[in-house]
Curated annotation (Swiss-Prot):
GO terms for cellular component: mitochondrion. InterPro entries: DUF4559 (IPR027897). This is Uncharacterized protein CXorf38. The gene is CXorf38. The keyword Phosphoprotein applies. Keywords: Methylation, Phosphoprotein.
Amino acid sequence: MVLSELAARLNCAEYKNWVKAGHCLLLLRSCLQGFVGREVLSFHRGLLAAAPGLGPRAVCRGGSRCSPRARQFQPQCQVCAEWKREILRHHVNRNGDVHWGNCRPGRWPVDAWEVAKAFMPRGLADKQGPEECDAVALLSLINSCDHFVVDRKKVTEVIKCRNEIMHSSEMKVSSTWLRDFQMKIQNFLNEFKNIPEIVAVYSRIEQLLTSDWAVHIPEEDQRDGCECEMGTYLSESQVNEIEMQLLKEKLQEIYLQAEEQEVLPEELSNRLEVVKEFLRNNEDLRNGLTEDMQKLDSLCLHQKLDSQEPGRQTPDRKA
């Protein structure tokens, strides 16, 4: 029975905390999307006003030679070279890693979002707008682009919490951790007191983190789901959808780490096995993640075969 599996999972307080923290990140993502979308357009307009020569009439002459790869980008035309300089001028981390591989430089003169992706983490080349991004992508943009006037320490604290959620091998966090997370995410939200949709989420997050989800196995005349002591109601399917989104994001994180060989093969294998064991015990979640798991298994198998080729060595962990 699907609900009994959900009840068993949420009977573990630390797993419930993990889901609640993840739900907060989903709420944060939803309230930032519109704001970020508007600000990216404003930022792009400002760039073009300051440097009209970079506008729609500017055309990349380098073609495929102006295609970036991961953190490497050596423009082969004047337009892309000037755009790169302009982006770096506004990049807080201009001397560090910039994920140029997210971008299509030929679109920079006409597409604000292609510019925004230069300020974001790796793996976002196919994202067409803020509505397709997770919370950490939007937070990283806010943190890395000097167009956003915020206390960057507050942004990095939330990013750090998000990474701890995604990197939690057993998908569990303590109640002490959750209280600390609540303080940090609310400190961040306080930076946007003039943005109505962000202000509206503040109380929802506070209510979520201070309430206790209780899962009930319903009788015939009762509704399925979770009911908080403060009266907020989440149906079983809503809770399940939150879990699915968090697990998909976690698997995507593992995939990117595997693709860029950021962790040792044994560590990667251990992380993957923990998720597989969890899904073996939770069929309701496993069925919706089959494609994600197959994609990850295929990459890991391919890398394993590559490492076994004569003369090939497993790369050292990246710094």
